[in-house]
Amino acid sequence: MKARLLLLSVVILVGMVSAENEKAGSCPDVNQPIPPLGLCRNMCESDSGCPNNEKCCKNGCGFMTCSRPR
């Protein structure tokens, strides 16, 4: 029982931390006729890894990169 309570607490804390790291706005649409390509490698893992107000978004290559929100 204590292990379940501890696991539940950890899940809640992780959810709170990830919600705090998300920046305002939404990622650019990569389902355009000509998607924004960017570099074909991961440049970030979450919004907190991006400078200023940029968000960590998928690019046209399928990798994650910092982008200006729309």
Curated annotation (Swiss-Prot):
Gene Ontology cellular-component terms listed: extracellular region
A UniProt-annotated Pfam family: WAP
Tissue specificity comment: Expressed by the venom gland.
Compartment list: Secreted
PROSITE patterns given in the database record: WAP (PS51390)
Major subcellular location class: secreted
GO molecular function: peptidase inhibitor activity
Protein family: Belongs to the venom waprin family.
Entry protein name: Waprin-Thr1
Organism: Thrasops jacksonii
